[in-house]
Amino acid sequence: GDKLILTKPLGAGIINTAIKADLVSERAREAVLKSMKTLNKYACEILKKYTIHACTDITGFGLGGHGTEMAAGSDKTLVIDSQALPIFPDVEEYASMGLIPGGAYRNREFAAKTGYVSTAKLWLEDLVFDPQTSGGLLAAVPAEEADEILGELKELSLPCAVIGEVIDRKKHTLLIR
């Protein structure tokens, strides 16, 4: 099956909630602002050189919402490795403080309609459903091309990662491990 590549860190919604609560660290604020200013066109230019079976930008519906749509539209299941997710600084701390935006709960409800299963820690599950502002691209690419794509993306200093894989459709559209 295909590998899933994510081109930007997750946690923008959680950090923005921490900003509103005046609890954010300077390093988290700077990291999220830098990411929001980084256009997806640079990652897109690299991805276009390869075989891309599906691609979407991760915005208000979060990785979980957009991933659910991608999986349902292709009659597949996405397996997300929560330990592989690129994450902004201090997100675990803010999530454990309950600084989760309301959109994350709505995104989780949306994904529950088509079905998801999670064995991940709660804060990582919250992160999967965290709405992103100017989030990265989620691309489904052939496994044999994933390392080369990742190498090119990292040459541009894009904080990307292989975060999971696409498998034949199971009962649920999204499995978060």
Regions of interest found by a model, annotated:
Residues 2-177:
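Helix-biased detector of long, well-ordered alpha-helical tracts
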